């Protein structure tokens, strides 16, 4: 598995304050994605022990709510094994931290993946430029869904996802300031080199 960046103290890619791992490799190549440098599975850096420890150091902090896997696509064939192994270690070491994952795949196609048992919230679906809406919470286009994975898996019919939250009016008052702010523009990835790059909802 390779990655492009580890973002710390992130408030845009999931509930609460989070650490975000941006992996390399994506086959969706969504039109309008402003993060195409993550599409190449051979790009970025090798995810090694030092990178893992960097994440663990963040998760050690009591104010960090959890980790978000984004990219790129964490479910790209080059990433699945590495992501699953890291998720397993995180759940064992930090059982109270939440795991979010962004993917361009649809829930219906991935719901039986064994790694789903480790994921708390999944944002699914390709970014659709025609459906782009910067007022949406935690996603870039209206076709995408923010899914409560464990609640969905506990149902008899797992093909109907339980949504983690609504998009606009049904978001509880105060949520924007107490947890994660509602998006007013594309998410920002701050690479170690100091260059800011906007990331649309593709972020799978």
Give short role names for the model-derived ranges.
Residues 1-4, 11, 17-18, 32-100, ...:
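Conserved Radical SAM active-site core
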Residues 1-22, 35-41, 167-170, 177-194:
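N-terminal [4Fe-4S]-dependent radical SAM core
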Residues 12, 108, 131, 155:
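Flexible, glycine-rich phosphate/dinucleotide-binding loops
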Residues 22-37, 198-204:
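Local cysteine-cluster metal-coordination motifs and their immediate loop/turn environment
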Residues 53-56, 60, 111-131:
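Structural recognition of alpha->loop->beta junctions
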Residues 77-83, 87-91, 132-193:
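P-loop/Walker A phosphate-binding loop and immediately adjacent motor/lid segment at beta-alpha junctions
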Residues 96, 118-119, 143:
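A generic structural signal for alpha->beta connector loops
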